[in-house]
Amino acid sequence: MDAFKPQIYDVGQHGSVSGCWRAIQTSMKHPMNEEIDLKRHLMIAAGALAASLSFSAFAGAATYQLDSDHTYPSFEADHLGGLSIWRGKFDKSQGTVTLDLAAKTGTVEVTTDMASVHTGSTKLDQMLQSGQFFDATKFPEATYRGAIKFNGEKPVSVVGNLTIHGVTRPLKLTINSFKCMPHPMLKREVCGVDAVGEFDRGDFGIDYGKSYGFSLKTKLLISAEAIKQ
């Protein structure tokens, strides 16, 4: 407590009244006051940094590249009017997603290799690639382009157009789950989505089995991950 002991200041010693007053002010700068000032400045700087980082994280649209190793469009289709369900997936897809969380907008562009269809049955795979279904030789790719729709802060659907078999039709996908996080191995942000849609394959000129009682309703299920660029 020595810093707070009364002190006597000699005007003559300090040359003038103003010099004496400066000496008094200097003596009043206790280390505790300096520490408080330092903490206040650090808190202000930290707040400014946090605000700038928060703003930059949501400023403008970010671009994400689909991770082909973790992106699988899959489908469910009827066999003989309810006898069983055919299930399969496409092993090769690529595309780009843009996402602006601040503006609540986004886009999706995906291209799928139709020859990469995989059901677990070589015979069925060959049939699906043939002219009876996808005609993958003539129409090697399917594409989907759409706009992401938000409900509040959350992406809830994609409204766009699907092109298969050379035919383009509207298709809405409902997003069941969506999450973005720092990937522990890639050390980059990754977003994942699970979405579902439904279409009539007859609308795309793929009506094999209709005369046998097949339902042409096809369920499309999307599991995808995309890496921020």
Question: Language-model segments: which ranges?
Answer:
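Serine residues within intrinsically disordered or low-complexity segments
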Residues: 16-18, 27, 54
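Bacterial N-terminal signal peptides that target proteins for export
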Residues: 34-46
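Bacterial N-terminal signal peptides
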Residues: 45-56
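Low-complexity, intrinsically disordered or signal/transmembrane-proximal segments
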Residues: 7-9, 13-14, 25, 30
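Aromatic (phenylalanine/tyrosine) cluster motif
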Residues: 4, 9, 55-58
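Low-complexity, acidic/polar, glycine-enriched regions of mature
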Residues: 59-229
